[in-house]
Regions:
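ATP/nucleotide-binding catalytic cores
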Residues: 1-173
């Protein structure tokens, strides 16, 4: 089965990349946020297994998020969750922070999304502002002030586009 792992900072485009990969396979992405799963000892692995099974039956590519949260849990839980991920019969995607440990056996596709520099962030701001029809003279001010990736830039521009009182200059952001 296909195993994709994407690591990077929040807002770096991990979700967008995994959604695109799932779409190329003719499927939708189903996000499983382990931060919302009850933390009762011995139950996390069973809960994850059940959710993965449901995703498989619905034809989704499950995307497990929040695995870094279980690193502080007891070692047994970590081992059990790793076993559930390794034995899942369908495709699976893992969304991890930069430099997180990967709880899969070799054979997965690893995509590390790098941190973007100010010029790249400026390009992302410019494209998102244009796409959402937001007039702003110089997006480089935003790129210098906010060290965020294209995912967050897109969400911010979508939100600003919905507002009736759009900021007219970078200082108002």
């Amino acid at each position: 089965a296909v195993r994709n792992v994407v690591r990077g900072r929040t807002g770096a485009g991990r979700h967008t990349l995994l959604t695109s990969l799932a779409a190329r396979a003719g499927r939708s992405l189903g996000v499983i946020d382990l931060g919302t799963v009850p933390r009762e000892p011995g139950k996390l692995a069973h809960a994850l297994e059940a959710v993965l099974r449901r995703a498989l039956l619905r034809g989704l590519v499950p995307c497990v998020d929040g695995l870094e949260l279980i690193s502080s849990e007891d070692p047994d839980t970590k081992i059990q969750v790793g076993a559930v991920l390794r034995t899942h019969p369908g495709p699976i995607a893992l969304r991890l922070p930069t430099d997180a440990q990967i709880p899969l056996d070799p054979g997965y596709l690893l995509l590390d999304l790098p941190q973007r520099n100010e010029i790249q962030r400026g390009e992302s701001w410019g494209k998102a502002l244009e796409r959402h029809h937001i007039a702003l003279q110089d997006p480089s001010d935003l790129a210098g002030r906010y060290r965020v990736g294209p995912g967050i830039i897109e969400r911010v521009c979508a939100e600003v586009a919905r507002r009736p009182d759009r900021p007219a200059d970078a200082a108002a952001w």
